[in-house]
Amino acid sequence: MKLLAVTVLLLTICSLEGSLVRRQVEEQSLQSLISQYLHIVTDYGKDLVEKAKTPELQARAKAYFEKTQEQLTPLVKKAGNDLINFLSSFMELKTQPATK
């Protein structure tokens, strides 16, 4: 009976130690995966900064913003005029009943 109890105790201890070792390995692999991911993201960010410094990209971005501004300016002016007309129609509605 004592032999059986000692055997069960040893098996339990070995099982617990094995699971502990597996957890430590999983944590280390997760940490290395995260550090590798952060390293890749950092390198990618550095590459983007270097590419953004090129004059060609800056010229393309400037041309894009100028083109967008040219297209949006008339739309914004029209929307402003429409809003003023809309609000003034409400003002006219309020003044009509007062004059009667």
UniProtKB/Swiss-Prot annotation:
Q: Where in the cell is it found?
A: Secreted
Q: Does the keyword Transport apply?
A: yes
How does this protein assemble? Monomer. Interacts with NAXE and NDRG1.
Q: Which GO terms describe its biological process?
A: cholesterol homeostasis; cholesterol transport; lipoprotein metabolic process; positive regulation of phagocytosis; protein stabilization
**Per its record, what are the GO molecular function terms?**
cholesterol transfer activity; high-density lipoprotein particle binding; lipid binding
Q: Which UniProt keywords apply?
A: Cleavage on pair of basic residues, HDL, Lipid transport, Secreted, Signal, Transport
**What is the stated purpose of this protein?**
May stabilize HDL (high density lipoprotein) structure by its association with lipids, and affect the HDL metabolism.
Where does it primarily localize? secreted
Official protein name in the record: Apolipoprotein A-II
Q: Does the keyword Secreted apply?
A: yes
Q: Which stretch is the leader sequence?
A: 1-18
Which family, according to the similarity comment? Belongs to the apolipoprotein A2 family.
Record organism: Ceratotherium simum
Give me the gene this protein comes from: APOA2
Which Pfam families does the protein's record reference?
Answer: ApoA-II
Please tell me one Gene Ontology term that the record gives under cellular component: spherical high-density lipoprotein particle
